[in-house]
Amino acid sequence: LIFNKSDIVPKDTTGGLDTVAIRMPNHPIAQALIKEAGVSIAAPSANLSGKPSPTLGEHVIDDMDGRIDMIIDGGMVGMGLESTIIDVTVEPPMILRPGFITKEMLKEVIDQVETDKAILTKPTDGLRPKAPGMKYRHYAPKADFRMYDGEEEKVANEIIKVANEKDSQGYVTGILTSDQNKHFYEGKVNDGVVVVSLGDLDKPETIANHLFKALRDFDKMEAQFIFGETFSRKNVGDAIMNRLTKAAGYNIINL
């Protein structure tokens, strides 16, 4: 939640801005840390800017080893996506970053909620996202990541073709799909192509939960090309596609 800050909030913690973002974790270990501290805590994200967000303790070590004093490992995250950011300094309140708390859920609590138009399209000089985490290609793997949108089997056939081409040329290549669509690739992709299912289309929270881990796993195997399917934008799917679109640098091919 973004509020106008009072004088008790140091500007060092807000990047010099007159607003402050307040967030509350739902993990019992994080809540225990806050309770023991007995003070307000400045809590930047536990990853380097531009890297996929951490969902495991080892991801934090990969990014922050030698940069911080301690890591408290609470196990795998419960949701897999960063928090929804909502600006309550404006009327009506505005979503600056979609997350697991969806617009539909917010509307059950407050009548009107808008979405920052800049997060729906590729950033331009005249339309830039207000939230720092929404900048161009922020949630990005090292590989050239392309997504394909269209009828499922048609998309799979195109991905099989381009993935096999890249693999035959000697590139380390990966594919992102779902449990329901994984069968399209079985026996049709080269042995060197790594096919990863993000989860169950009927349970989009499973896709959200595995998204960043999959991107980091591709980084570890030094993938040079990743080809992925798009997903429904319904409910939490909006946040999933927001992260994937940015990870792909808005490189979505419509079939």
Ranges and model annotations:
Residues L1-L255:
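Active-site-adjacent structural elements in enzyme catalytic cores
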